[in-house]
Amino acid sequence: MAPSRNGMILKPHFHKDWQRRVATWFNQPARKIRRRKARQAKARRIAPRPVAGPIRPIVRCPTVRYHKKVRAGRGFSLEELKLAGINKRFARTIGISVDPRRRNKSTESLQANVQRLKEYRSKLILFPRKPSAPKKGDSSPEELKMATQLSGPVMPIRNVFKREKARVISEEEKNFKAFASLRMARANARLFGIRAKRAKEAAEQDVEKKK
């Protein structure tokens, strides 16, 4: 194969009938057409539902390196659905993805996703199962006429960054050790239980000594 990018130039020692083992890519254009046709067929099949599939929750990326960014998660947690007033079984039938394994670790993420669900529910045009006998919660005939298939992602997630104005750095900020503070905070969180246990044992020993 041809050298790629700025890597080391190899000195390949070709043996074992190497010409039979050359990887080819002649089916790429046809595969591209096939994928496109499959997408179009799926869009026609699921119409008037959104092409991109069900709505996904807003989640933060894991690890310190990426947790400044938000992205789409797998599914909404059961707690989020409960606060939004949506049944978990009914949610799947109206284009809401559900992940019963997910746990909410912060109030901010919980509130953001509950608000997302409520907004989605208010915008949703719900077709009746039987057009002759619509049920409570189904959209009106006027709204059904307005319904169009959404081609992009449902309620796309955007990373919004606030720009801070330039200002003079204070002396306290200059002396602040960010890395050491983070390490200390992590250590305190990790050792919280052990320290509490030791403090409890020490207090019990003091009580015994006083006796």
Curated annotation (Swiss-Prot):
The entry's keywords: Cytoplasm, Ribonucleoprotein, Ribosomal protein
Molecular function (GO) terms listed?
A: RNA binding; structural constituent of ribosome
Span-the-membrane segments of this chain are none
Q: Name one Pfam family in it.
A: Ribosomal_L13e
One GO BP on record is: bone development
Q: What is its main location?
A: cytoplasm
- What's an example GO cellular component term for this entry? endoplasmic reticulum
Q: Where in the cell is it found?
A: Cytoplasm
Q: What does this protein do?
A: Component of the ribosome, a large ribonucleoprotein complex responsible for the synthesis of proteins in the cell. The small ribosomal subunit (SSU) binds messenger RNAs (mRNAs) and translates the encoded message by selecting cognate aminoacyl-transfer RNA (tRNA) molecules. The large subunit (LSU) contains the ribosomal catalytic site termed the peptidyl transferase center (PTC), which catalyzes the formation of peptide bonds, thereby polymerizing the amino acids delivered by tRNAs into a polypeptide chain.
Write out the similarity annotation.
Belongs to the eukaryotic ribosomal protein eL13 family.
What protein does this entry describe? Large ribosomal subunit protein eL13
